[in-house]
């Protein structure tokens, strides 16, 4: 039994240690306070060590003066009975005390605090996740490595630089993922900073080793050979580089012979070798998505823009909004996307965030085949669910959604609160279940998701837009506003133009909350039409 308790005591902290910090900026802020506490503890340790050294220094200076005098006339010195007594006392007692002082470990307090805090530290998954986020932001927002390394990002308050070690680490993360495109970019950045004279524990040989292989994997044999020769100039005995040099020369000689025999083979070979650039899975939708995230989307024609209006909305003469109607703005026409301004107060936002923070967990998606909830690489955020009955503010927010949309919220899902992490995003997806996903919301028994209501609970310094790649719409976060759209036509058929995504957060902290309203209860609130696509 005692052994069982010990094992649980040892293992339990480890289970709590890795909440996936990189998926939530909100939770990452806790790490700042943790590190500040450790710095304070470290300074206390340094002060204790300095006090200890000061005592030893004073002792040494006193003995230096004493022994200098004694060695000039040893017999005369010890001939004095007091000096003889004090010599015996020093060597028998005081030197032992000094020994204890020297051996005294002043680090106990710091080590104890560090051990306690370490169980809440990020792990390898967090570090790799944050690195991948930087690579994702680099692609989405067309940032070059030098811009990121110098910290020249839009809207930043706290500029931060990447060292050679940082660039090298990013390159290694990409290398581990077989992402040789980003490996090359970041190893070249590391090499550039070394050439500029930056002092680093990473040497050029290590950088060139990764760089030459990454270039080779992308089909540029000439450059790979050149980099390998450069490496061997620095380290002629490098075994892998010597092996690679022979292999690259062999491949190039073989290609040269093949090119002589067939011009067709030559053109085929060029096609095969030149693969540098975007990843294989870089689909046209991805390109549209990234363009929209950068604000380079399709511009609506003036004729269509004239049909978009701002208005005061009273919720179809709802008593709550007759005297103080909501401010409504058309963001897009098809699908119709409406933004409500000043629809949630700062005080309400703080209550919702405070309720959600302790419950934040890595956001999941429903597997279209199994129906199971699972985490995925393309959704980087943490979420929590809030019920209306647990707090009057949540209940009031739910009723506000019902009053303004005219839809019944009693069959809606709970309010989902999400906080996005480093480069936090949710790639293109549908909110509704398609015909090949009949079991997606079966357990709820409330039909499909008829509409989406999305609150923006923070401003975002850069990035973080909600985009609709099918139609070219971009909706930018603005604290205190909300956007609303129907996922289904009145017929119950899914509106595929509502496929949308949350762009990566480039700079800042993004908080949102959303309400998914379902079909049940809307039969008379939004009756079916005769047309399938209306």
UniProtKB/Swiss-Prot annotation:
Domain of life: Eukaryota
Residue positions with a glycan: 113, 259
Entry EC no(s): 1.14.11.2
InterPro entries hit by this protein: Oxoglu/Fe-dep_dioxygenase_dom, P4HA-like, Pro_4_hyd_alph, Pro_4_hyd_alph_FE2OG_OXY, Pro_4_hyd_alph_N, TPR-like_helical_dom_sf, TPR_rpt
Signal peptide: 1-17
Residues in Fe2OG dioxygenase domain copies: 411-519
Disulphide bonds in the chain: none
Keywords in alphabetical order: Dioxygenase, Endoplasmic reticulum, Glycoprotein, Iron, Metal-binding, Oxidoreductase, Signal, TPR repeat, Vitamin C
One Gene Ontology cellular component annotation held by this UniProt entry: endoplasmic reticulum lumen
Keyword Acyltransferase among record annotations: no
Region Disordered: start-end pairs: 258-277
Cellular location(s): Endoplasmic reticulum lumen
Stretches that traverse the bilayer: none
Name of the protein: Prolyl 4-hydroxylase subunit alpha-1
Species this chain originates from: Bos taurus (Bovine)
């Amino acid at each position: 039994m005692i052994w069982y308790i010990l094992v649980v005591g040892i293992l339990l902290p480890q289970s709590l240690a890795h909440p996936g910090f990189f998926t939530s900026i909100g939770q990452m802020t806790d790490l700042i306070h943790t590190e500040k506490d450790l710095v304070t503890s470290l300074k206390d340790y340094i002060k204790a060590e300095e006090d200890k050294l000061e005592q030893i220094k004073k002792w040494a200076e006193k003995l230096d003066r004493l022994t200098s005098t004694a060695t000039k006339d040893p017999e005369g010195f010890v001939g004095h009975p007091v000096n003889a007594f004090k010599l015996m006392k020093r060597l028998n007692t005081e030197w032992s005390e000094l020994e204890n002082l020297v051996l005294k470990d002043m680090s106990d307090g710091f080590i104890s605090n560090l051990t306690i805090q370490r169980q809440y530290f990020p792990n390898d998954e967090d570090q790799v996740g944050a690195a991948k986020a930087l690579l994702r932001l680099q692609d989405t927002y067309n940032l070059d490595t030098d811009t990121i390394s110098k910290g020249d990002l839009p809207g930043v308050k706290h500029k931060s630089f990447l060292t050679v070690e940082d660039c090298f680490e990013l390159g290694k993360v990409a290398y581990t993922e077989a992402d040789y495109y980003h490996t090359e970019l970041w190893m070249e950045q590391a090499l550039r900073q070394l050439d500029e004279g930056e002092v680093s524990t990473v040497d050029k040989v290590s950088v060139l080793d990764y760089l030459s292989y990454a270039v080779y994997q992308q089909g540029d044999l000439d450059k790979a050979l050149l980099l390998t020769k450069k490496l061997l100039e620095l380290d002629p005995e490098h075994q892998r580089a010597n092996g690679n040099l022979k292999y690259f020369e062999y491949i190039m000689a073989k290609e040269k012979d093949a090119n002589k025999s067939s011009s067709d083979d030559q053109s085929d070979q060029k096609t095969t070798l030149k693969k540098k650039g975007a990843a294989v899975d870089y689909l046209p939708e991805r390109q549209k998505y990234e363009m929209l995230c950068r604000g380079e989307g399709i511009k609506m024609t003036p004729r269509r823009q004239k049909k978009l209006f701002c208005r005061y909305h009273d919720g179809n003469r709802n008593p709550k909004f007759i005297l103080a109607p909501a401010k409504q703005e058309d963001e897009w026409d098809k699908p119709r996307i409406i933004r409500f301004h000043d629809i949630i107060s700062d005080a309400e936002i703080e209550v919702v965030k405070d309720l959600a923070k302790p419950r934040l967990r890595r956001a999941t998606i429903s597997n279209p085949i199994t129906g199971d909830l699972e985490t995925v690489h393309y959704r980087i955020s943490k979420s929590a669910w809030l019920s209306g009955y647990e707090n009057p503010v949540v209940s009031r927010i739910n009723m506000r959604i019902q009053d303004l949309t005219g839809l019944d919220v009693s069959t809606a899902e709970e309010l989902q609160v999400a906080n996005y992490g480093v480069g936090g995003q949710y790639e293109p997806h549908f909110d509704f279940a398609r015909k090949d996903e009949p079991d997606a919301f079966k357990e709820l028994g409330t039909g499909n998701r008829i509409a989406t209501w999305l609150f923006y609970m923070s401003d975002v310094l850069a990035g973080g837009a909600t985009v609709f790649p099918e139609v070219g719409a971009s909706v930018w976060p603005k604290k205190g506003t909300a956007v609303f759209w129907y996922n289904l036509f009145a017929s119950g058929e899914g509106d595929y133009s509502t496929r949308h995504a949350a762009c990566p957060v480039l700079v800042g902290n993004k908080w949102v909350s959303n309400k998914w309203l379902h079909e049940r209860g809307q039969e008379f609130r939004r009756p079916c039409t005769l047309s399938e696509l209306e």
